[in-house]
């Protein structure tokens, strides 16, 4: 039993932040505050479904966050490591003894002329909602271009095509670069069945985006009423702005215990941190493991013990290709893909099970945290009446 109460602030309420907060809140003597710019939890692995209306991709924090976790709806603007204080956009500050840096990731500026001005993103709630509105204002027969053939691009292209849209997928090189060559085949067959035009090859690169089209590296110009950019992610620049060391993608640099190389009181969880010698793929699968691991690092330090290196286990990647079919790409525990897969309707079922399992894991964590203490005031929200809060944490 700890003699003094320890204050832990979790910055970011995604998969990593929520799992870390719930784990910490189970421990007596630890008070947890979660700072997040939105009053709801965003189920990011369902954002492509929000675009077509098959899911709203949002859960109330009351469902996934322990009742003894204090929720502050605001945007963190700076971390003062020396004073152990987080400044908020609403004008206040939150002090901490330990901090979990879990700001997640979002779309990056690809540096392609016109992309920022005219393309849409599916990497956050606001972007997905804007895309949905743009599609609603566009005739169903109008051409739609999806740029990037990673998981987000594949799922978005298939979802739109199944909804009756005329979709072109510009791969940037190869279809499904994170997939095994054998697993790309059922993906290609499914996209062809849905009527998606797939452009592959070294010159299948978008070099310019306009209001009504895209230009490729080989000179081709494609009409596009709605262009969706899914290639590349970057984390918010909060760590860099706070004077903490980051990598080229803006991720907080940590050691093998997820601890910032600049301050042992700051621990990263999810997409926002990186161990340079052991980088993990930015993913929900990684985040739900890194959140509890970050919490354990802090709890061990509080108890006067040495923090242990993080251990990860990966099972594969689940992709939905519309509502009726999908592909599950299996991997070795180190996240290296192999040739094993499940496709078709069974693949779609596995994806749906994975999504529900992830949500159930968060709900279970919230219940365990809530069982430790009585419920108090949960929500402090200078922006709680405004759903469209600033992007990024």
Question: Positions of the model-derived regions?
Answer:
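C-terminal auxiliary extensions adjacent to catalytic cores
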Residues: 323-393
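A Rossmann-like FAD-binding core segment of flavoenzymes
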Residues: 70-79, 86, 94, 163-256
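Rossmann-like dinucleotide-binding core of oxidoreductases
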Residues: 143-189, 193, 197-199, 282-296, ...
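Conserved N-terminal Rossmann-fold NAD(P)-binding element of oxidoreductases
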Residues: 11-12, 101, 147-148
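FAD-binding core/adjacent interface of flavoenzyme oxidoreductases
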Residues: 2-6, 69-143, 228
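A conserved FAD-binding loop/helix module that cradles the flavin
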Residues: 240, 248, 272-322
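Beta1-alpha1 glycine-rich phosphate/pyrophosphate-binding loop at the start
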Residues: 2-70, 155-181, 392-393
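FAD-site-proximal beta/loop scaffold in flavoenzymes
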Residues: 117-140, 214, 221-226, 230-289
């Amino acid at each position: 039993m700890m003699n003094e109460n320890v204050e832990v602030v979790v910055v970011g309420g995604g998969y990593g932040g929520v799992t870390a907060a719930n784990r910490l809140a189970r421990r007596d003597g630890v008070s947890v505050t979660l700072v997040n710019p939105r009053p709801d939890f965003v189920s990011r692995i369902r954002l492509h479904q929000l675009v077509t209306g098959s899911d709203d991709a949002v859960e109330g924090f009351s469902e996934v966050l322990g009742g003894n976790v204090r929720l502050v709806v605001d945007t963190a603007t700076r971390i003062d490591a020396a004073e152990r204080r987080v400044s908020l956009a609403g004008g206040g500050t939150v002090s901490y003894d330990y901090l979990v840096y879990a700001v997640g990731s979002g779309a990056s500026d690809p540096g392609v002329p016109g992309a920022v001005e005219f393309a849409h993103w599916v990497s956050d709630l606001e972007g997905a909602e804007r895309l949905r509105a743009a599609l609603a204002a566009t005739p169903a027969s109008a051409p739609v271009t999806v740029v990037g053939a990673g998981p987000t691009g594949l799922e978005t292209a298939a979802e739109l095509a199944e909804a009756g849209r005329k979709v072109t997928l510009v791969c940037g090189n190869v279809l499904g670069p994170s997939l095994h060559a054998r697993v790309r085949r059922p993906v290609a067959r499914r996209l062809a069945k849905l009527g998606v035009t797939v452009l592959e090859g070294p010159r299948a690169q978008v070099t310019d985006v306009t209001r009504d089209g895209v230009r490729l590296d080989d000179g081709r110009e494609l009409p596009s009423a709605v262009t969706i950019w899914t290639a590349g992610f970057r984390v918010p620049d909060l760590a860099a702005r706070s004077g903490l060391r980051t990598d080229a993608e803006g991720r907080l640099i940590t050691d093998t215990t997820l601890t910032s190389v600049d301050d042992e009181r700051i621990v990263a969880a999810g997409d926002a941190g990186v161990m340079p010698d052991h980088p993990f793929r930015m993913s929900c699968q990684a985040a739900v493991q890194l959140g509890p691991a970050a919490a354990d690092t802090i709890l061990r330090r509080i108890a006067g013990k040495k923090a242990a290196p993080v251990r990860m286990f990966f099972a594969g990647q689940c992709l939905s290709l519309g509502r009726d079919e999908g592909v599950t790409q299996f991997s070795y525990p180190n996240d290296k893909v192999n040739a094993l897969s499940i496709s078709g309707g069974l693949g779609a079922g596995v994806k749906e099970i994975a999504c529900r399992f992830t949500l159930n894991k968060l709900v279970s964590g919230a219940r365990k945290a809530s069982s430790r203490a009585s419920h108090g005031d949960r929500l402090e929200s200078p922006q709680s009446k405004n759903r469209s809060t600033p992007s990024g944490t």
